[in-house]
Amino acid sequence: MSDVTHFSKVVAATASTLVSGDLSQSHVMRDISRPAFQKRIFSFSKRPSELVRITSSSKDVLLPDEMLVDIPSNENQFSLFQGFQATLPEHSVGSQLLLGDGSKVGEKSAREQLVEGKKSLSHKLDLLEVRKALAANEITEIDARVAHLQSMRQIVFDRVASLEQQEFQLESEVLRIDAELEQMEEEKEEVIQRHDYETRTPEELEDDVVDLKSVSEKLQSASQKTLPRRNLSRRKTQPTLQQYYEPGNKIRQIKAHSDSVTCLDFDIPFGTMVSAGMDLGLKVWDLSRGDLVTDLKGHNASVTCLQVDNNVLATGSADATIRVWNLDQVVSNPDAQDEGDDAYTIHVLDSHVGEISAIHFSDHTLVSGSADKTIRQWDLNTGRCVQTLDVIWANSAQNALYSNDRLRTGFDANAPFIGAVQCRDAALATGTADGIVRLWDLRSGQVQRTLQGHTAAVTCLQFDDVHLATGSRDRSVRIWDLRMGNIFDAFAYDSPITSLDFDNRRIASTNGENTVKIYDRAAEKHWSLGRGEGDPEAPESTVVKTKEGYLVEGGGDGVVGVWAC
């Protein structure tokens, strides 16, 4: 009996502890303290039964305030049961009448039928309202999820941008160290060669026939600045951030010049950009930050054309000179120019006697076109002109060409005589003021093929392995098949084409309007981007360059816009 007594005391103590505080119920405590309950405890081992009979109603069940704190507010005007009813399938009234007793229909008066019909329609209307509210709630939930995903995407997007910025910085440092190591190796070889020559005995000098002039030239060339090596495969990282922008979105805007932008180019997306303007400025920019690196000095007039190829910059100016710059030195030591204007200059090419209107270089060959009606080929290793191509037909047509402002063919006599050039290996393509595109062989200096179709001056061109794209003042862009020599595709805009750039996916061009024209080559679709899309009063776009879905355009107000395309 002592064990049973001990058990009853433990049960009573435990029960009093569990139901104490806010969760206590007075009638349960009264039942436990009654003698009848104690008697049932003693007989529990022989006749198991319910210790406490719950006789309380729902009105007696109370919830403490602590359990009601986190209940959300009911913003829905419909009950849970109404929502359940709205999800049940409907049965048409007509089918119910047909399935029921048809004799009862006639017994009802017309008024009763109308009242029942109204009730049925009202019920359906209520169900539709509930369903509409449920659908609206789903839309709200989806919008909230989309907003949350967008915020998460922005966080990851910023993380990718930060990682790419760190990659660019480390990559630039690696390339700078590689360039210094290569320079040290070259200097070491030069020292060894000088030492070997200076330590030769008089007998060795007498035995060998030495050309003093050639030795002097070698020593002089060794002391000159050399063209840095350009190898794109050296870059271990490639930018990808531009792929995550929607086409047509603005990435950045830079107030680059105080006057119209005449030309620009960049190496890679978010890399290094060089721009020139009518304000005589020639500036180097960090596209990842939008910061000015330095302002290059050297030309005595505005820069009319330029090209950036990895770590080399070539600029052509209205002062009839071409300058070749080392961009590695510009980026690594932007203050070196304070010591002199030639701190970054590799070569100054000054054989032309007229304004430089077009340049292009590939590997160690640079080709330039000038207002002096000549095309010159340069060796970038030595900085010397190795060939001059004279456009003979221009001399005979000069009087007719400039006798009035506009010819019968429709092109403007004020257009550059040589509007565009591009070279690759021994191939050269030129576009001139007569609207003809000529394909040259640099080995022979002869024209191999002419492409005729434009009716005004050719202002820009670019070719790859298969196609050549040309833009003209006749407002058209033509794509030529280099294998067959005929037109592959053509389209026109409302104004003369001023610049053009293309890749396998799209052709971007400017035509004096305030937007950049994009032609999707795969979808054969035209669309536009630029400040003019949202502002009809925006200034015109003067020049465009694009690479891998990353587009940079210069405006007539000196602003450079960076866009995703």
UniProtKB/Swiss-Prot annotation:
InterPro entries: G-protein_beta_WD-40_rep, WD40/YVTN_repeat-like_dom_sf, WD40_repeat_CS, WD40_repeat_dom_sf, WD40_rpt. One of its GO terms (biological process) is mitochondrial fission. CDD domains: Mdv1_N (cd22881), WD40 (cd00200). WD repeats lie at residues 256-295, 298-335, 351-390, 401-452, 453-492, 494-529, 534-565. It is a peripheral membrane protein. It is found in: Mitochondrion outer membrane. This is Mitochondrial division protein 1. The lineage of its organism: Eukaryota, Fungi, Dikarya, Ascomycota, Saccharomycotina.
